[in-house]
Amino acid sequence: METTTSSPNAVASPQPQRRRNRWLLWTGRILLGLLALIVLLAASGAAYEAIMATGDARRYPPPGQLVDVGGHRLHLHCVGQGSPTVVLDAGLGEFSLAWGAVQPQAATSTRVCAYDRAGLGWSEPGPSQRSPQQFAAELHMLLTKSGERGPYVLVAHSISGKTARLFASQHPNEVAGMVLVDARHEAVDERLTLEQLTAEDDQQRQFQNMIKWMARFGLVRLLWAPAWPSVQPGSENLSPETRTAIGVLQARPRQIENALAEGAARTDSNSLLRSAAPLGDKPLIVLASAQSIDHLPFWRKHSKA
């Protein structure tokens, strides 16, 4: 009976190696194709955003005037006649059109001005340092240079409440009264622990980076602008033209970056606010939403102080 033994020098079949090489080749081609597709989509998105942003200036011209406040211009829109002049300051990341339903009605009885903080709406970007203290200084210069005379009634929403309080403390003779609409008090920030603040800042930083990149490639414009009216409470009170303009202008990369910068600097002027002079015997109205944040009792306590 014969037995067969394999030679130690026998060569393995080349088929498995060939299949492996073929698989690696096709995998590389697929990955390269996906990379090329991603680059193409990114370039197309960036081009789309650039083209649309160029057209925004033509489609949505500023309703007011641009006033130089020291190296950059701020947008100021005033209507109506009478005194005192009402100055409307929008909330975090918002601009003058947020008052689109309020300003025309209030202007039937007095002078009403709405403005855009630096980098928002139609205003040009300003210094990198964005804080309520900086906002108050720029607002005072804006009103002075534009020729809008006081005394002013300051109407401030959200984070702008800090700006209004600093403005009133620094220029008491130019303020006739104040209306705070869901204004944020510095004590709300101070009740958070260092761990909570750090966690909040980390989450915001991650969110900021994601939104910035989405905006640069046109994704925010595509997704946010059409959806804005359906997710923003009170938007039904605005005209269709105003709703469209807000959705488009808020989706621009510049708008988003400056809005995020405002949020990052939300606590920068808290020490000044703690020592700010009170409004005294001048009229003060505090408006709070019936559906507010979870720490509303704490907010109410300090808004009455």
Model-derived regions: residue spans:
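Alpha/beta-hydrolase fold catalytic core
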Residues: 2-84, 108-110, 305
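Conserved HGGG/HGGXW glycine-rich cap/lid loop of the alpha/beta-hydrolase fold
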Residues: 72, 78-122
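Active-site loop/oxyanion-hole signature of alpha/beta-hydrolase fold enzymes
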Residues: 77-79, 117-155, 171
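The conserved beta1-alpha1 loop
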Residues: 87-91, 157, 182
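Conserved catalytic-core motifs of eukaryotic protein kinase domains, centered on the activation segment
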Residues: 98-100, 123-129, 190-191
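Flexible "cap/lid" subdomain of the alpha/beta-hydrolase fold that forms the substrate-access gate
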Residues: 132, 174-175, 179-305
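Gly/Ala-rich beta-loop-alpha elbow adjacent to hydrolase catalytic centers
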Residues: 156-160, 164
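Active-site signature of alpha/beta-hydrolase-fold catalytic machinery across serine-
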Residues: 166-170
